[in-house]
């Protein structure tokens, strides 16, 4: 099991890469490590934060995709209808943009859910 250490402000989380269910996304994202971006609160998706990535292309298609991630299920949206992004849900979330409902690749899961701060 490959793990990630994720730091958001003063908080640090440990997540497992979902390599069995999203192998292409995990492999492509792993090549970017260490990864650093700004995270902002989501506008359309509910209780989530997101990392807008514009036209960035990770060269992956859809795999293990969902519109309804549980808290801690991190999604990568490969772009198409809306800009590329990473979604970091911490509560009730329906992944969407101003274009409507989206689906993203669930590629990592925070497994210390009690540590997610709302």
List the predicted regions and their residue ranges.
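A generic structural signal for residues embedded in beta-strands
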Residues: 76-77
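Short, Lys/Arg- and Gly-enriched loop/turn segments at beta-strand edges
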Residues: 82-91
């Amino acid at each position: 099991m490959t793990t990630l250490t994720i730091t958001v402000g003063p908080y640090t989380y440990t997540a497992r890469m979902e390599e069995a269910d999203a192998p292409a996304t995990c492999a492509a994202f792993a090549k970017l490590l260490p990864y650093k971006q700004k995270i902002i609160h989501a506008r359309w998706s509910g209780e989530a934060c997101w990392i807008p990535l514009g036209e960035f292309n990770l060269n992956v298609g859809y795999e293990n995709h969902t519109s309804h991630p549980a808290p801690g299920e991190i999604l990568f949206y490969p772009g198409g209808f809306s800009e590329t992004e990473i979604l970091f849900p911490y509560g009730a979330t329906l992944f969407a943009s101003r274009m409507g409902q989206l689906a993203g690749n669930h590629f990592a899961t925070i497994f210390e859910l009690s540590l997610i701060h709302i």
